[in-house]
Amino acid sequence: MAAQVIPELQSLNLKTEGGALPQELAPSGAPENEDGDSEDDNGDDQGADESRTIEVLAAKKKKKKKPKKKKKDTQKAQTEPPRVILSALFPNNEYPVGELVEYKDENAYRTTNEEKRYLDRMNNDFLSEYRYAAEVHKQVRQYAQKTIKPGQTLTEIAEGIEDSVRALTGHDGLTEGDNLLGGIAFPTGVNLNNCAAHYSPNAGNKMVLQYEDVMKVDFGVHMNGRIVDSAFTIAFDPVYDNLLAAVKDATNTGIREAGIDVRMSDIGAAIQEAMESYEVEIKGTTYPVKAIRNLNGHTIGQFEIHGGKNGKSVPIVKGGDQSKMEEGEVYAIETFGSTGRGYVRDDMETSHYAKVPDAPNVPLRLSSAKNLLNVITKNFGTLPFCRRYLDRLRQDKYLLGLNNLVANGLVDAYPPLCDIKGSYTAQFEHTILLRPNIKEVISRGDDY
C-alpha cells in the first residue's frame, strides 16, 4: 500500500516583490504610506499588519479539515472451523506453490532447459486450479488434525471435513451442476484399523472413534476437475508410531523416486524396501510392517480420479509394471502398510460409487434407475460419490435404482478394502505434478 503523505505547512511569503502585503491580505481601511510618517511608525504599522495576517492564515488552517486516513488493508484470516472462501484470502488469485523438487540424473537438464520452461509457463490455468484445490485441502486437513478426538462419530468427522471443503471452494453442491465446478472430489474416507480404504459412513451410521483406533483420513478437493488427492493417518496411542512412520517414509520415498521416464516397477521396489525396514510392537508382539501389495498409487485425470481408460498404476511392491511415467502427468503417490497379511479384500457395506466413463448405452427398464442416472450425471459426472451425497440432494428410495445401475455396468461400486481382522493399517498420500521442468508435490504441507 502506498504510504499516505500528510502535507506539511508551507512557509508563507507574506510580502510581494515590492515589500507590501498582498492586497487580499491587507486589512481593510489601512492607510497607505504618507509623507511625514516616521520610519518607526511605518515599522510599527507593518509589524501589526503582519501579525494580523498570520492570525488570519492560522485561523484558516484551523478550519481546514485534515484528509482522512485511509483504512489499512487487513489480510483476512481463516476461521475455525474453516468457512472463509479461499478466493477471499488470496484476492490476487495467486495461490501457494507446492514443494518443488528438481529432476535428477538424466532428467536434470529439464530444470534449466529454456524450451521446457516455456512449456511450463503455458500451464497457468492448470496450475492455478491445482494450487487452489491443494490449499483448500491443506487448510481443511490441518484443522481436522487438531480437532479430531476419540468420542466423535465417523459421520461427524466426515461431514465436518466435507462442509469445510464446500465452504472454502464456494460450491455447496446443492444446485444442479455446482459440484462439477469445484468442491468435493470423492467421498471422505474414514477407515479404521484393518480397513484400509473406501469406507465412508452411510446414513444412520453410529460408529464412534476410539482411543485405540488407527484411522486413515482420505479426502479430495477439485477445481474444474483438477483433483488433489491426499491422505493421512491418525493414531492417539503412541504404540502405533512406528507403523505411521513406516508408511510416511514409504510415501516420501515414492515421491522422491517418481519422475519423467521412471519405470513404475523401480518406484514400487523402492517403496517396499523403505516400508518393510520397519517393525512395530503392539501388546508385546512384534509385527513386521508389510506393504499392502494389491493397493496402488495411480494417475489422476480431469474429473477422473484413477486417470480414466488410459490410467496407470504405481505399485508399492517390487516387480510387475514396466511402463514409465511421462511429462505432464499427474499422480497420486499413496502407500499402505499393514501388520496383517499385506493383502486386502472387499468387506462391509458399500458407500463409494462412480459413474463409468464412456459406458455403453444400456436400455434401462427401471424408471428409478433412469432418474438416478440423470441425477448422477448432472451433479457428479465421473467424480465418485457416496450415498450421503444422494441424501443431500433429497433423493430417496434410490437403492434399487442404484443397484440396477451397478448391475448394468453404468456405475461402479467400490466396497471397503480390508486386511484380516485384528490387524492395523496406515496410509499416507500426496498428489504430484510432473511439470516439464520440475516436479511439484502440490499437496505438500507443514503437517506431512
From Swiss-Prot:
Its EC number is 3.4.11.18. Substrate binds at residues 198, 306. It catalyses: Release of N-terminal amino acids, preferentially methionine, from peptides and arylamides. It is an enzyme of class 3 (hydrolase). Residues 1-83 are annotated as: Disordered. GO terms for biological process: proteolysis. Binds 2 divalent metal cations per subunit. Has a high-affinity and a low affinity metal-binding site. The true nature of the physiological cofactor is under debate. The enzyme is active with cobalt, zinc, manganese or divalent iron ions. Most likely, methionine aminopeptidases function as mononuclear Fe(2+)-metalloproteases under physiological conditions, and the catalytically relevant metal-binding site has been assigned to the histidine-containing high-affinity site. One of its GO terms (cellular component) is cytoplasm. Keywords: Aminopeptidase, Cytoplasm, Hydrolase, Metal-binding, Protease. This is Methionine aminopeptidase 2-1. It comes from Ajellomyces capsulatus (strain G186AR / H82 / ATCC MYA-2454 / RMSCC 2432) (Darling's disease fungus). The lineage of its organism: Eukaryota, Fungi, Dikarya, Ascomycota, Pezizomycotina.
